[in-house]
């Protein structure tokens, strides 16, 4: 059985964002996959397609 749960790392502890139902003493394997910046910031800014294209072009050109 595979379960995917978002978590946050704070003060040396990995905290799950939702509870999971596992039996006491159950051993698990954890695979850490950091969220991409695009996933963390999705929906925060309202940008037009033109603005997004300009930002991407600026990044690709090294900020020029």
Curated annotation (Swiss-Prot):
Gene3D superfamilies: AF2212/PG0164-like (4.10.1150.10). It comes from the Archaea. SUPFAM superfamilies: AF2212/PG0164-like. InterPro entries: AF2212-like, AF2212-like_dom_sf. Keywords: Toxin-antitoxin system. The keyword NAD does not apply. Possibly the antitoxin component of a type II toxin-antitoxin (TA) system. Its cognate toxin is VapC2 (Potential). Belongs to the UPF0165 family. This is Putative antitoxin MJ0975. It comes from Methanocaldococcus jannaschii (strain ATCC 43067 / DSM 2661 / JAL-1 / JCM 10045 / NBRC 100440) (Methanococcus jannaschii). The lineage of its organism: Archaea, Methanobacteriati, Methanobacteriota, Methanomada group, Methanococci. The gene is vapB2.
């Amino acid at each position: 059985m595979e379960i995917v749960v978002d978590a946050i790392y704070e003060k040396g502890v990995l905290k799950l964002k939702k509870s999971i139902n596992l039996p006491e003493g159950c051993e698990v394997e954890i695979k850490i996959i950091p969220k991409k910046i695009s996933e963390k910031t999705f929906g925060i800014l309202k940008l037009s397609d033109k603005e997004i294209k300009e930002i991407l072009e600026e990044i690709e050109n090294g900020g020029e």
